[in-house]
A protein has these predicted regions:
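Non-catalytic terminal regions with compositionally biased, polar/charged low complexity
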Residues: 1-138
């Protein structure tokens, strides 16, 4: 299960980078399961999950010793896709900060990491509670 894999990767203390790959439908399912607030992406024809989108979840260590997390959707602008331009530091993709329903960000636009972990676990539990027929359809 994708949510479990992401949650397991985020829990690893020695992991510096993980790349998991999927389709826009996978991204949409993850965003729905995590209860991401509704949004409309700027500079995109597909305003929810454009082709080639990535969910980027960063784990940060604060000066207070607490772990924090950010969730962003990274995607190419429609003109970058249309013109087939290479994404570089001078021609970067768009970064859109995602918000989770009923969770508060701090002044740095970050969530407490434990709250994000709990959100993942809630979504995993909700999936596990589904009848088998619904799991097969998902």
């Amino acid at each position: 299960m994708t949510l479990q894999t992401i949650s397991d990767e985020l829990a690893l203390t020695d992991r510096k980078f993980t790349f998991l790959c999927g389709h826009d439908s996978n991204i949409e399912a993850i965003l729905g399961a995590l209860e991401v607030e509704d949004y409309t992406l700027p500079n995109a024809i597909e305003t929810r999950v454009p082709i080639g989108s990535k969910i980027v979840i960063c784990k940060w260590l604060g000066d207070d010793g607490q772990e924090y997390s950010s969730l962003d959707l990274v995607y190419a602008k429609s003109e970058q896709l249309r013109n087939k331009t290479i994404l570089t530091l001078d021609n970067p993709p768009m970064f859109f900060s995602l918000s989770l329903q009923n969770l508060q960000k701090n002044s740095d636009d970050l969530y407490k990491f434990e709250d994000v972990q709990e959100r993942f676990q809630d979504a995993i539990n909700a999936y596990n509670d589904l009848p088998q027929a619904e799991k097969l359809a998902a």
